[in-house]
Structure formats: C-alpha cells, structure tokens
Amino acid sequence: MMQLMLYASTLITSIILFKMNHPLAMGLMLLIQTIQISMLTGLMAKSFWFSYILFLIFLGGMLVLFIYVTSLASNEMFSLSMKLTTISLFIFSMILIINILLDKSSISFFIQNNEMQSIYNLNMFLQENSLNLQKLYNYPTNLMTILLMNYLLITLIAVVKITKLFYGPLRPMN
C-alpha cells in the first residue's frame, strides 16, 4: 500500500512539474520527487543505504542548480496555483480511498498490535540487512561502490573549482 501511495504521489508531482513556470518552484518539485523516488528504492531494496546515497547525490546536484538559478533568475515571487493543488489533492485522496476499499489487508494492518509488529519487523530487518550489506561490498558489486566513490570525489573537486569566487561562471558582474 505504501508503494502504491508513493507511485501515485510521484505521478502527481510529475504532472505538477510540467505546470510550473518558475525555476525555484520547479526545483522544489524536483526535490520532492527525489525524496519520493529515494523512498521507493529503499522500500524495494529492503535497505535504505542505496537510496540514502542516491538522495545525497541528487541533493548535491540540486544545490549546484540552486546556486545557478538564484544567481541568474529574477527576484519575482512565485505561488502555487490553487486549482492545481486542489486537483492533485483530490486525485491523491481518491487513490487512497480506492486502495483502502479494494485491499482488505490494509484495514487489518491498522488493527494489529503495533508494538509487537515493530519488534518482529526490527528483528527481521536486522537479519536481512546484514546479508544485503555483505552483497553490496563483495566482489561483483564492490567495483560499483568504488566507481561511485570516485565519481563523488571528482564531482566534489569540479564543484569546488567551478564555485571559486573570482573564476568560473559564478563570478560577480561589475
């Protein structure tokens, strides 16, 4: 049920993104969509490490884009369209209601004892998490991890070089 909700909200933010015309509003929608996609990948992988790293990479790119947009865009205010917001909330609530009515197990999920369920889930998560992390750092996938580390280092060096005060595209105009 959680995945269906995230899929629906990702679809709605994608539709809203096409209707935006201000760069800061588009950046906000892109950040919200990045959070949703990171949550979806974490739910699919049973470990949130990969989605956390993915979110940090996207957030670093978004910060660089935010610097460019704030230095180049005008100082006009932006506001969300009330019509678009109400339509998206209506669609999202309809998907939620239809999902609850069609999926009877989602109703029994709210009736269960939450304390015992959380203890059981924590125990299962700890057992599966150690196996997933071993798979991440063993032979076939350790090359991908090293490649990701090198990519992040090169990106960090490039961003530092680009954002020097008197060199590059971010220098002040006189």
Swiss-Prot record:
<keyword id="KW-0813">Transport</keyword>
<keyword id="KW-0812">Transmembrane</keyword>
<comment type="similarity">
    <text>Belongs to the complex I subunit 6 family.</text>
</comment>
<dbReference type="GO" id="GO:0031966">
    <property type="term" value="C:mitochondrial membrane"/>
</dbReference>
<keyword id="KW-1133">Transmembrane helix</keyword>
<keyword id="KW-0679">Respiratory chain</keyword>
<keyword id="KW-0830">Ubiquinone</keyword>
<keyword id="KW-0496">Mitochondrion</keyword>
<dbReference type="Pfam" id="PF00499">
    <property type="entry name" value="Oxidored_q3"/>
</dbReference>
<feature type="transmembrane region" description="Helical">
    <location>
        <begin position="48"/>
        <end position="68"/>
    </location>
</feature>
<dbReference type="InterPro" id="IPR050269">
    <property type="entry name" value="ComplexI_Subunit6"/>
</dbReference>
<feature type="transmembrane region" description="Helical">
    <location>
        <begin position="143"/>
        <end position="163"/>
    </location>
</feature>
<keyword id="KW-0249">Electron transport</keyword>
<protein>
    <recommendedName>
        <fullName>NADH-ubiquinone oxidoreductase chain 6</fullName>
        <ecNumber>7.1.1.2</ecNumber>
    </recommendedName>
</protein>
<keyword id="KW-1278">Translocase</keyword>
<feature type="transmembrane region" description="Helical">
    <location>
        <begin position="24"/>
        <end position="44"/>
    </location>
</feature>
<keyword id="KW-0520">NAD</keyword>
<feature type="transmembrane region" description="Helical">
    <location>
        <begin position="82"/>
        <end position="102"/>
    </location>
</feature>
<dbReference type="InterPro" id="IPR001457">
    <property type="entry name" value="NADH_UbQ/plastoQ_OxRdtase_su6"/>
</dbReference>
<keyword id="KW-0472">Membrane</keyword>
<comment type="function">
    <text>Core subunit of the mitochondrial membrane respiratory chain NADH dehydrogenase (Complex I) that is believed to belong to the minimal assembly required for catalysis. Complex I functions in the transfer of electrons from NADH to the respiratory chain. The immediate electron acceptor for the enzyme is believed to be ubiquinone.</text>
</comment>
<dbReference type="GO" id="GO:0008137">
    <property type="term" value="F:NADH dehydrogenase (ubiquinone) activity"/>
</dbReference>
